Every structure is written in C-alpha cells, then in structure tokens.
Amino acid sequence: MGQKIHPTGFRLAVSRNWASRWYANNNNFAAMLQEDIGVREYLKKKLKNASVGRVVIERPAKNARITIFSSRPGVVIGKKGEDIELLKSELQKRMGVPVHVNIEEIRKPETDAQLIADSITQQLERRIMFRRAMKRAMQNAMRLGAQGIKIMSAGRLNGIEIARTEWYREGRVPLHTLRADIDYATSEAKTTYGIIGVKVWVYKGDTLGRNDAPVVEEVAEEKRPRRNARPGDRRPRRDGEGAPAGARRGAPRRGGAGDGKTGE
C-alpha cells in the first residue's frame, strides 16, 4: 500500500531549505535540537493571535538569529516595539546566548499552508461545519494564485461515533515532482469529541533554485583535450571541404598517360 512521504523532507536541498540552520557535534546535537523544539512551542503559544506561519532558527558564532514569518507583524512587534523586546529577552533567557529577532511579513496568508490549517482548526473548535471550512479555504487559495490545493481532515467529524477521513482537492498537486513548490502543514483541533487532525498541501507552481532553496555554487566545467590528440590534428569534413584538389566528391578526373584516352 503506497504511503505519502513528507513533501518538505522530500525536497530538502532541492527546492526547500531547513527550518533549523546550524551545525553541532554529536555531544551537543540532541540538546540544541530539543532547545529549538522548545522555542517553537513557546512562540506558538505566545504568538497565538499573530498568525505565525513558520519560524527559522540560525546559530552563527555563539549567537542566535530567529526569523518569524507572520501575516500580522504589527501584533508581534507591539506598540513602539515593546512586545518584541520582551520576546527577545525571554528567548535569551531560554537559549542562554544573545538573540536577534527578525519579523518577515507573509504577503498572501490565504496561500500559506500553515495558516490555512490553523484557520480550519480554529473554525472546527468554534463548531463550524468542516466541509464549509475546507471549501472556503480552497476557494480563497485558488482565487489568490495557488495552482492546486488539497485539504484532509480526520477524526470524529461533526461528532459522529466512528472516526473517518475526508479530503477535497482543487487543481493539481504533483507530490512526486521535485521541482514542484509544495507547501505542506498540519494542525490539530481540540474539540469536545476529541482531536481532529488537518493536513494541507498547496501547489504554488514549479520552482528550482529560487525562493527558499539553498544556494549551491556552480563549478565551471573545463573542456578536456581529446585523448592522444596532437595540436593541429583535425578530422576531415564529411562533405569533402578542405580536401586536396581532385579529391572532392564529384570533381572531374584529369586525363593522363595510361588512362586509355587520346587527345584529338
């Protein structure tokens, strides 16, 4: 039975980049990874109303640089930058190193997979019909430039006794094409009947080497000389050009002694 690979992990180093960008040896790797997970969970709770799409963490030279992608950057920054300063000081206490916080605005939140999934889960928690929430999100995404979208919900939908899975798709979502820019995200709705999981795939068109792809330096190929070739060697052309006079195809032969012809 075929299963779906994670679209982001499948495209790492091709058209996607890592969300945590740092290097650690074997002794520190687990602790730093656990620290990143804790920072993301803290930011998710702290900025619940700021529509945060994703968080990128970098660690250059005993520092930390955190980039927060949000569709409402004003909520993150706060009045006169007060909220972001409090956030920065809290993150420095957690990580133990100087932290720089950058805010990036998401221009089209209707086509961001994480924001779509979070929006659907919030509607499910407010007891809105799951079909209505899913179809409305699909219509908004297609209207604002997405080439395809697929949404799947699983759990006790509408409070039924037996859990089931339902999904809807509009446009095309080529999961096996590496150059396809697939934005994938998941979210969970905590309802009175239990947890309902939501998965979202958004196809934004083909891409290779742009957007969030890692930069790879291209090495110029050197033309190697032909094996056992000497300078000045040249193969004769097939049409006979460059051959000595009389050797070209179709050239008239000259008469001479012993050719059986006598001049008249």
UniProtKB/Swiss-Prot annotation:
Q: Which InterPro entries match?
A: KH_dom, KH_dom-like_a/b, KH_dom_type_2, KH_sf_prok-type, Ribosomal_S3_C_sf, Ribosomal_uS3_bac-typ, Ribosomal_uS3_C, Ribosomal_uS3_CS
**CDD domains from the xrefs?**
KH-II_30S_S3
Q: Where is the composition biased (Gly residues)?
A: 253-264
The GO terms this record gives for MF are:
mRNA binding; rRNA binding; structural constituent of ribosome
One GO term (biological process): translation
What are the Basic and acidic residues biased-composition ranges?
Answer: 230-241
Task: Look up keyword RNA-binding and say if it applies.
Answer: yes
Disordered: where is this region? 217-264
| Pfam family membership, one | KH_2
Q: Which domain of life is it from?
A: Bacteria
> What keywords is this UniProt entry annotated with?
Ribonucleoprotein, Ribosomal protein, RNA-binding, rRNA-binding
Q: Which GO terms describe its cellular component?
A: cytosolic small ribosomal subunit
Describe the location of the KH type-2 domain by residue ranges: 39-107
UniProt-listed HAMAP family: Ribosomal_uS3_B
Query: What is annotated about its quaternary structure and interactions?
Result: Part of the 30S ribosomal subunit. Forms a tight complex with proteins S10 and S14.
- Family recorded in the similarity comment: Belongs to the universal ribosomal protein uS3 family.
Q: What does this protein do?
A: Binds the lower part of the 30S subunit head. Binds mRNA in the 70S ribosome, positioning it for translation.
Protein's UniProt name: Small ribosomal subunit protein uS3
